[in-house]
């Protein structure tokens, strides 16, 4: 390519950059007006259902060469910046900084939100319930290790609801304050992360003691003070805490993802591509669970997941968590819930919300 041709292309790119900048500021002015209207009508600045529709329309109209994920990433920050012009969004998450929950929160809300790490799951729910932070992000299940019981326990009692879901691909690294693997005697991490790379650790560090922590980011912080320790955490945690990456991609299965929930007050509106999560209990008699679930089959509503959870106050009795396709405000779904209620001793709608994008 000739130099003058490259110069011409760069000039055209520069002109497009200026036009994009003009349009972004024009969009910002419109966003401020939208914020004023929302304020007068008492509506939320962050509307998960509306944003899900925006992303679906953008990716549906995308003709390339930008891949859909790139389009989502770009517009995530545009929307995050527009929200910040209206009212700053504050989000509580299971910390510390650089945990996978922090990464999920950033991926969902964008960089212009304000993020507050919490050391315990209960504090996140308490913040949301008391409007200290109106939004929270919590892990609910991993594709390899299953459900996060702490989150399930909080969902039983909370007045907050599920407003959205986030899927995050998990890539695990072995981090240390040095590059000498032979010096490692202890491995720190969250129990789910340790489970996700169980075989790799057994083959490569069989004699190391494994120490459980509250999060992968906490493990990275512990390693700063332990020269004989290593952490199973993310590359972002290595950057945040100034650690070396000794090995990357140590998870036993590459298709490793964690699902997170966005919790908040109120309810998300239908988008046409939604999920609903419920919690229920049945009488302790033969066939009770079958009867409770029969309405799903009759209405041809797809049950995505069901799992039992022990009742703390009643030994050997269980609650059931279930996810299914559809929104509670839709006629067919509402009928299923009404019929199901006849066969349960307890039924709680945890929330209907837009289906998350699986990366």
Give each language-model segment a name.
Residues 1-359:
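Domain-level signature for soluble enzymes in the chorismate/prephenate branch of the shikimate pathway
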